[in-house]
Amino acid sequence: DITRNHLSIVLIDLALNIIDNTRLRIPFHESHDYFCILKQEFEKIVSKNIPDRSKLLGVGIALPVIIGEDHKTVTYATVIPLSLNIYNFFSDYIHEPFLFFNDANSAGLAESWKGDYKDAVAYLSLSSSIGGAYMNNKMIYGGSNNRGGEFGHMTIIPHGKRCYCGRYGCLDAYCTANVLTDFTEGNLKEF
């Protein structure tokens, strides 16, 4: 999971049990230095836990962006700046098969799979941006252009605060973790 300020690497088995994980505070930059750190941390976890590399089935990379149908293209990114050829950039550092996933869809799907949800489920992600996912029968509903769960950009206050997306009154402009901590002197747990 790559965010504006953190890199998280989680190794799971096919039953979705967490085998190992790490989280680093490191601002995202589409640079050689950043991707060297990503590769180093990825290699640490894999080599420690999977002696037989052929047992690693693949890598999912969660990003706070809109992902194309092929899971290899980024169609819209404002939370973190990414170039359109980012898949090629990643492939210089990650040599196992990998695909991109929207961060909220990825988290929502994991919750859906781990839970005993058989009907429609909505997942809301509150972090440095607001995200969300709709699932039905443990499958993501992407909607038009894979924006089905983009709760953060629903207008809650017409003509309200300007959002980073360029529109006004979006939920994201009012309810991100960063905004909410302004009410509690930086301590989100107090909110």
Feature-to-residue mapping (PLM):
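Short beta-strand segments
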Residues: 1, 58-64, 123-129, 133
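HTH-adjacent hinge/linker in prokaryotic transcriptional regulators
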Residues: 1-32, 70
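Glycine-rich nucleotide phosphate-binding loop and flanking beta-alpha elements
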Residues: 6, 67, 130
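Hydrophobic beta-strand positions
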Residues: 11, 66-67, 134, 155
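Glycine-rich, phosphate-binding/catalytic loops in enzymes
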Residues: 16, 77-79, 182
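Hydrophobic "anchor" residues
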Residues: 18, 73-74, 140-141
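Glycine/GP-enriched mid-protein hinge/lid loop-to-helix segment characteristic of carbohydrate kinases
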Residues: 21-23, 30-31, 89, 97-191
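Glycine-rich phosphate-binding loop and adjoining helix at the ATP-binding site
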Residues: 22-122
